[in-house]
């Protein structure tokens, strides 16, 4: 028994000494633990400075390019497609020639298919507001009365057609007579006045429902009102209630 106890004590002492030796670092295992090498990650996203410096550049096309033909004759270009050295010292109504150049981006040729940068155009010496009405278009108004005394006028803005050349501003103000139609026919109104005027059909057709009701319940004013309306419509004195002209 004593021998066994002695062996246990010796084993405990050896175990204690072995543990102390290992903990002191001299008896550490010889395995080498490889440390992972940190590889620098490449940033695949551009920095904020680079992102702001990269911008999509868009080229804005001039407005006149929409009406300027490509590879056409220079003499047929619209006025907005060329720049001409005009002067106001010409004689009104006379034919005058001006030197012109095509605007940037406009390519044109002469009659021999040769590209031209400088060319001439001929036009009548007159300002744009002096052109005949067929050479410009105006903004029409439907808020005025066509049947009035004196005849009503209104102010509007007119623009010269693209192919017409003139001096001065191509957009100008103009005073026009009130002249618009709402779709009423003079022949229809006159026919209704002759045939059904006693029932006020002509007045109802023209949009004058109050007068139409008066004629309807008075049987055309016993025929007198009917005869008067036939005369007034025939001479154009009575027209549509909206103030428009007959077709």
From Swiss-Prot:
Its main location: membrane. The keyword Transmembrane helix applies. InterPro entries: TM2, TM2D1-3-like. Residues 31-179, 237-247 are extracellular. It is found in: Membrane. One of its GO terms (cellular component) is membrane. Residues 1-30 form the signal peptide. Residues 183-231 form the TM2 domain. The keyword Methyltransferase does not apply. Residues 201-215 are cytoplasmic. Glycans are attached at residues 87, 99, 139, 155, 169, 179. Keywords: Glycoprotein, Membrane, Signal, Transmembrane, Transmembrane helix. It is a multi-pass membrane protein. The chain crosses the membrane at residues 180-200, 216-236. Belongs to the TM2 family. PANTHER family: BETA-AMYLOID BINDING PROTEIN-RELATED, TM2 DOMAIN-CONTAINING PROTEIN 3. This is TM2 domain-containing protein 3.
């Amino acid at each position: 028994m004593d021998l066994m106890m002695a062996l246990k004590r010796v084993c405990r002492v050896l175990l204690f000494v072995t543990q102390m030796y290992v903990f002191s670092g001299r008896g550490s295992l010889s395995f080498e633990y490889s440390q992972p090498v940190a590889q620098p990650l490449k940033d695949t996203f551009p920095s904020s400075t680079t992102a702001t410096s990269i911008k999509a550049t868009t080229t804005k096309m001039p407005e006149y390019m929409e009406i300027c033909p490509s590879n056409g004759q220079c003499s047929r270009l619209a006025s907005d497609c060329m720049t001409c050295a005009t002067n106001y010292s010409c004689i009104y109504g006379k034919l005058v020639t001006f030197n012109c150049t095509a605007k940037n981006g406009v390519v044109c040729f002469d009659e021999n298919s040769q590209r031209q940068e400088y060319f001439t155009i001929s036009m009548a010496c007159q300002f744009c507001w002096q052109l005949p009405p067929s050479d410009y278009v105006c903004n029409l108004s439907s808020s005025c009365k066509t049947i009035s005394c004196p005849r009503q006028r209104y102010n509007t803005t007119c623009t010269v057609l693209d192919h017409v050349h003139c001096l001065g501003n191509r957009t100008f103000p103009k005073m026009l007579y009130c002249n618009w139609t709402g779709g009423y026919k003079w022949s229809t109104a006159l026919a209704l006045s002759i045939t059904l005027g006693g029932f006020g059909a002509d007045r109802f057709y023209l949009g004058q429902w109050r007068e139409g009701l008066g004629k309807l319940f008075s049987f055309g004013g016993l025929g007198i009102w009917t005869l008067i309306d036939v005369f007034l419509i025939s001479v154009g004195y009575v027209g549509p209630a909206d103030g428009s002209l007959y077709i």
